[in-house]
């Protein structure tokens, strides 16, 4: 099956004077461009670069089109640069977006000035068991025709006690276009849940490729996504990588926003 790119929704944060190539930001699984608003504004000021916070396919306001694979999402990223006449950009990717960013850099290295990989590795990586429970519960919520956000929150609280994580997951709820009294998820829950094995993986076709430009890897020490055993794999694909480890969980940009943003600003300004 030949892949076709989709037009990605985005929010642009313009620098007062853009002195350097722009930055593309790719969110994680079930995230969206909205999760990055405050950091994107900060980056545009501190980096003198235009910042594009982007919704990946099947997320946010971008089209819901199969397949949800890294080859497809990287092609979307490449097409986005083409459509917006961006000769070169730096890319920041978190979680699923980190793999999209890595695949894009490996396939089109001349298009990527610098790469920032946030808490994911270039290999097969099991998602925590919580994700299966999240998706099963989200399907139940979608089918329940709920009329209040609080009802969805109550249902989700049976599988996730942390209110911040629940609020992140439920940020995908919106009023149903066919019935404004009920809420539905804006993302295709069934398609994404069927694509989890692909999302856990990394394309084997890239095994002989190298991205030989500066790469920053930000690791969350309280998450399982970048174990020490992954570091030689980073060295193979990204020989110029440097590692920053932060004492937090997987949602690094929420838990350690100051340290996270300073690491990226220093790296991109260097």
Curated annotation (Swiss-Prot):
<dbReference type="Pfam" id="PF00561">
    <property type="entry name" value="Abhydrolase_1"/>
</dbReference>
<feature type="active site" description="Charge relay system">
    <location>
        <position position="95"/>
    </location>
</feature>
<feature type="domain" description="AB hydrolase-1">
    <location>
        <begin position="21"/>
        <end position="257"/>
    </location>
</feature>
<protein>
    <recommendedName>
        <fullName>Abhydrolase domain-containing protein C22H12.03</fullName>
        <ecNumber>3.1.-.-</ecNumber>
    </recommendedName>
</protein>
<dbReference type="GO" id="GO:0006631">
    <property type="term" value="P:fatty acid metabolic process"/>
</dbReference>
<comment type="similarity">
    <text>Belongs to the AB hydrolase superfamily.</text>
</comment>
<dbReference type="GO" id="GO:0006629">
    <property type="term" value="P:lipid metabolic process"/>
</dbReference>
<feature type="active site" description="Charge relay system">
    <location>
        <position position="190"/>
    </location>
</feature>
<feature type="active site" description="Charge relay system">
    <location>
        <position position="250"/>
    </location>
</feature>
<dbReference type="InterPro" id="IPR029058">
    <property type="entry name" value="AB_hydrolase_fold"/>
</dbReference>
<keyword id="KW-0496">Mitochondrion</keyword>
<dbReference type="GO" id="GO:0008474">
    <property type="term" value="F:palmitoyl-(protein) hydrolase activity"/>
</dbReference>
<keyword id="KW-0378">Hydrolase</keyword>
<dbReference type="GO" id="GO:0052689">
    <property type="term" value="F:carboxylic ester hydrolase activity"/>
</dbReference>
<dbReference type="GO" id="GO:0005739">
    <property type="term" value="C:mitochondrion"/>
</dbReference>
<dbReference type="InterPro" id="IPR000073">
    <property type="entry name" value="AB_hydrolase_1"/>
</dbReference>
